[in-house]
UniProtKB/Swiss-Prot annotation:
It is found in: Cell inner membrane. GO terms for molecular function: transmembrane transporter activity. This is General L-amino acid transport system permease protein AapM. Part of a binding-protein-dependent transport system for L-amino acids, affects the uptake as well as efflux of these amino acids. Probably responsible for the translocation of the substrate across the membrane.
Length: 384
């Protein structure tokens, strides 16, 4: 047998070759994403021109020409407006934010009692951070403390009683109200939404009809209407002398509205589960609730994590609508302070809205990034 007729047997593994020079690095990314076609080149040039024009103006207005400290509006107004700045001046009035910062966070909460919401915030962070870390131990205990124990402690600290001065909810406001509304809405909407989604897929006609009616009615009206009904119409159906706290009405309205949307998100995840998963669970002899808890629901939630977090983000932003029922969240308390004569100037409203927008963006961006992290962490599917 000649050498040419012998079968080839590899005795060593060749080292991996690096990719071609033009396929990696920043230059390759720019060529592939920004300069791939003539249309991309034109759009890139226009975008760079817009950035080159806007960024210096924004930096100048937000930082260089900005007023960082001052006792009143005169530091944020020109001489023609009764201030000390030269005519033609324009810049952010961060002194307004600095002077009203405590009110933006706590609303009209009594100054001497603001240590109470501060403690609630610290407890919330201490319980939330381990909950967000996938590898953290004792998740069950952590969840009980966060969603069952903390609300009781928070209500006692924020509202008062049992030795603490009572602070009525009309005095609450600012970021504190935004976080309370969004946390309760999110914490209630997920389990209620799961039950509604399961009820809508139920084989029992009465339960299915009730869930479908609830979901479609709530989804068919705007949140403003739900809040108005909860605030104005709900007391009309209560016995004489009964009075439901305004904040509680808002919490009920936000929770109901978010639950209806969450139910449709969860239902979409349930419909995406292959039929074989249901049949496999049945073949193991699992009951309905065992099958749902152990096999079906974990997969459904994993599939719709982006939509769930998107609903959470929408809930956080929708809390600003409570101003129509006389409550002042972060945005509402910022806008309320525009009428303060001591800080009335042309740049005060713009600065206040930028501050509120940045706070909202910070929370929403954090939720979005965590959603992406959880998607990657739970991406256990088999890909070809």
């Amino acid at each position: 047998m000649s050498v040419a007729d012998k079968p080839f047997v590899r005795t060593s593994i060749l080292a991996a070759e690096p990719p071609p020079p033009g396929e990696r690095g920043a230059v390759a990314w720019i060529r592939r994403n920004l300069l791939a076609t003539p249309k991309d080149v034109i759009l890139t040039i226009l975008a760079l021109a817009l950035i080159a024009w806007a960024v210096p103006h924004l930096v100048n207005w937000l930082f260089i020409q900005a007023v960082w400290s001052g006792p009143d509006r005169t530091f944020c107004a020109t001489t023609l407006q009764g201030g000390i700045q030269p005519d033609g001046w324009s810049g952010a009035c961060w002194a307004f934010i600095s002077a009203k910062y405590d009110q933006f966070i706590f609303g009209r909460y009594p100054l001497g009692e603001r240590w109470r919401p501060a403690i609630v915030g610290i407890l919330f962070i201490l319980l939330l951070v381990p909950m967000l870390i996938p590898s953290a131990p004792r998740k069950g205990l952590n969840a009980i403390l966060l969603f069952a124990v903390l609300p009781v402690i928070a209500f006692w600290l924020l509202h008062g009683g049992f030795g603490l001065e009572v602070v009525e909810t009309p005095l609450w406001g600012g970021l504190m109200v935004t976080l309370v509304l969004s946390f309760v809405g999110i914490a209630v909407s997920l389990p209620v939404g799961i039950l509604l989604a399961l009820g809508r897929r139920s084989r029992m006609p009465v339960i299915r009809m009730l869930c479908v009616t609830f979901i479609e009615v709530i989804r068919g009206v705007p949140l403003i209407t739900v809040l108005f009904m909860a605030s104005v119409m709900l007391p009309l159906f209560l016995p004489t002398g009964w009075n439901v706290d305004k904040l509680l009405r808002a919490l009920i309205g936000v929770s109901i509205f978010t639950s209806a949307y969450m139910a449709e998100v969860i239902r979409g995840g349930l419909q995406a589960i292959p039929k074989g998963q249901f049949e496999g669970a049945d073949s193991l002899g699992l009951g309905y609730w065992q099958k749902t808890r152990l096999i079906i629901m974990p997969q459904a939630i994993k599939l719709v994590i982006p939509s769930i977090v998107n609903t959470f983000i929408g809930t956080f932003k929708d809390t600003s609508l409570v101003t129509i029922i006389g409550m002042f969240d972060l945005l509402g308390i910022v806008k309320l302070n525009f009428s303060d004569a001591n800080w009335a100037s042309a740049v005060t409203p713009i600065t206040g809205l930028i501050f509120a927008g940045f706070i909202f963006w910070l929370f929403c961006f954090g939720m979005s990034r965590y959603s992406g992290f959880m998607e990657r962490h739970l991406d256990t599917g088999h890909k070809r």
